[in-house]
């Protein structure tokens, strides 16, 4: 096996040929506890080529759309690489999508073929089944359904160009407006090269995959980049519940992980913070010994993640400042990645040596970032990006595509930020989330939520505007509220005291314009996106809270 050297690739076909040629005997994918069901780079190529030939025989050629609806698994990569390097277009669908969402994506994308896992097969509507030319079981690659009348000859594949479409990724984000993001071969291939320059990984590295592969973060950094550098990716057979994740970490001992903030925030709030708070000695040491206690706990934290982690990438949402402050003091090898589906995704990052709490860092290799339409008083402006990784547009939606580009061709991220004297970017909040104060002030709910989330017992929160007032919707941490073990009167009394505490702490810490008027307690977890961001639009006007339930009684 050759030693890893930078190799320029501008299509995923070239990436596929490069990885499977250079690392032939090296393991590419496998389950966390067995090689059975996994692939070396060589056997991976054989399988992908075989499945591609099957698609060709069923009349599926270049330009045809092929959907993948499955949880993460080794065969997900096989499906993807049997589609894209041969000129077809992949339509990944998030595994937690509803039957209606799947149907809408299939219809809008005009997909002809569907790879579906056995776990997700129950969410395929009869409408989709009737429309499909071909359906394939992703667990076994057996043909579930074929329509002989819909193809009359073999499909013709082609060698894709950098400008050709590789995938259309559907994302509704936190706004609820689903859109198909069209990414070219150049978009994704360039971001793979960006990853190499941002964080060099080699064939010796081990990835533990815990994010859905249908999400662009895991697709690019967790599937395409390992293909480029020859690393091995390990998969879990089920969603990463704590017990399974801990077991997998001990077995795999990963060097590389890609996660969302919620995972490390749960570890911090559920284990690390209570440990410090319960001991006066630890609390004193943490405050007075220049982070020594954090570094000691940080060593244990690293051991929890298998003991070999050298890159713990956090992306998809903003990391809680208090948690990041701890990780920084603990010298934990985390990195912050910033990006969007529309940018393939990585456009900004903060690595070892220049991380600072709350900053997304600097632009990544081959990407330009700047602030657009800057407010001269506050220094706030919208982050705009330019580079080979920026999408072609939204599928079948030229009006929306035009709206997200400036007149001189910069992509508008909708993130409002400021820059410090060193050029580092700090996000204040989303343009779409911003609330206009009574005197015209820009109120960013994310800044208020950062304060609320550090109050004892708070797991997550969002701040919404209702009738000109700011209302905090709060979800308690697990086991903080004993819903079924206390009388109704005692429960309401405890909640009232807790809400008063949240209001007091929050309003002492935020500006006059950002004062919260009331707190409501969620009875159920917030509904989230694939990267665990709360779907804010669901709670703008109402929410399943204790207060609403009380009104109905």
Report each predicted region and the residues it spans:
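Conserved AMP-binding/adenylation subdomain of ANL enzymes
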Residues: 189-206, 213-299, 308, 333
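Conserved pre-ATP/AMP-binding loop-to-beta segment of ANL
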Residues: 27, 151-170, 177, 200-206
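Conserved C-terminal "lid"/linker of ANL adenylate-forming enzymes
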Residues: 435, 460-463, 468, 503-553
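Structural core segment of the AMP-binding/adenylate-forming
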Residues: 58, 85-146, 153, 468, ...
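AMP-binding/adenylate-forming catalytic core of the ANL superfamily
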Residues: 97, 114, 387, 392-393, ...
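Conserved AMP-binding A3 loop
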Residues: 38-42, 166-192
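Conserved AMP-binding/adenylate-forming core of the ANL superfamily
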Residues: 28-59, 64-73, 77-81, 98-103, ...
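Conserved AMP-binding/adenylate-forming
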Residues: 293, 297-424, 431-434, 449
């Amino acid at each position: 096996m050759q030693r890893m050297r930078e190799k320029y690739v501008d299509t995923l076909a070239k990436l596929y040929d490069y990885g499977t040629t250079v690392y032939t005997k090296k393991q590419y994918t496998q389950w966390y506890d067995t090689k059975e069901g996994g692939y070396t780079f060589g056997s991976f190529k054989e399988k992908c080529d075989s499945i591609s030939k099957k698609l060709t025989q069923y009349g599926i050629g270049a330009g045809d759309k092929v959907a993948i609806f499955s949880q993460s698994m080794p065969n997900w990569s096989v499906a993807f690489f049997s589609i894209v390097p041969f000129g077809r277009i992949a339509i990944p669908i998030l595994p937690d999508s509803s039957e209606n969402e799947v149907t809408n994506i299939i219809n809008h994308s005009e997909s002809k073929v569907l790879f579906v896992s056995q776990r997700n097969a129950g969410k395929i509507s009869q409408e989709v089944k009737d429309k499909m030319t071909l359906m394939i079981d992703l667990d076994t690659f057996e043909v579930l359904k074929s329509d002989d009348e819909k193809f009359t000859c073999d499909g013709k594949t082609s060698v894709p160009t950098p400008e050709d479409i590789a995938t259309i990724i559907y994302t509704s984000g936190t706004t609820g407006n689903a859109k198909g993001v069209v990414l070219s071969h150049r978009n994704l291939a360039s971001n793979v090269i960006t990853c190499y320059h941002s964080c060099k990984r080699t064939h010796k590295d081990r990835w533990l995959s815990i994010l859905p592969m249908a999400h662009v973060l895991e697709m690019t950094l967790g599937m395409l980049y390992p293909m480029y550098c020859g690393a091995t990716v390990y998969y879990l057979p089920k969603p990463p519940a704590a017990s399974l994740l801990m077991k997998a970490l001990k077995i795999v001992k990963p060097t590389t992980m890609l996660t969302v903030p919620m995972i490390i925030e749960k570890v911090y709030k559920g284990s690390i913070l209570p440990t410090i708070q319960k001991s006066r000695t630890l609390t004193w040491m943490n405050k007075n010994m220049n982070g020594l206690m954090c570094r000691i706990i940080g060593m244990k934290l690293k051991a929890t993640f298998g003991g070999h982690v050298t890159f713990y990438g956090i992306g998809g949402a903003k990391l809680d400042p208090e948690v990041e402050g701890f990780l920084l003091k603990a010298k934990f090898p985390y990195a912050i990645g910033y990006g969007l589906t529309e940018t393939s995704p990585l456009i900004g990052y903060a690595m070892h040596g220049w991380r600072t709490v709350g900053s997304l860092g600097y632009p990544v290799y081959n990407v330009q970032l700047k602030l657009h339409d800057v407010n001269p008083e506050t220094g706030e402006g919208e982050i705009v990006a330019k580079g080979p990784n920026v999408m072609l547009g939204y599928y079948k939606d030229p009006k929306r595509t035009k709206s997200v580009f400036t007149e001189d061709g910069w992509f508008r991220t909708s993130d409002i930020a400021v820059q410090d004297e060193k050029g580092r970017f700090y996000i204040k909040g989303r343009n779409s989330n911003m609330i206009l104060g009574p005197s015209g002030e820009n109120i960013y709910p994310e800044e208020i939520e950062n304060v609320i989330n550090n109050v004892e017992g708070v797991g997550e929160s969002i701040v919404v505007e209702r009738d000109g007032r700011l209302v905090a919707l709060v979800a308690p941490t697990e086991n903080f509220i004993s819903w079924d073990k206390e009388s109704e009167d005692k429960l309401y009394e405890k909640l009232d005291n807790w809400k008063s505490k949240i209001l007091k702490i929050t309003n002492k810490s935020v500006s006059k314009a950002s004062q919260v008027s009331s707190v409501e307690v969620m009875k159920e977890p917030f509904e989230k996106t694939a990267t665990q961001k709360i779907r804010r639009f669901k709670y703008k006007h109402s929410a399943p809270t204790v207060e609403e339930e009380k009104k109905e009684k």
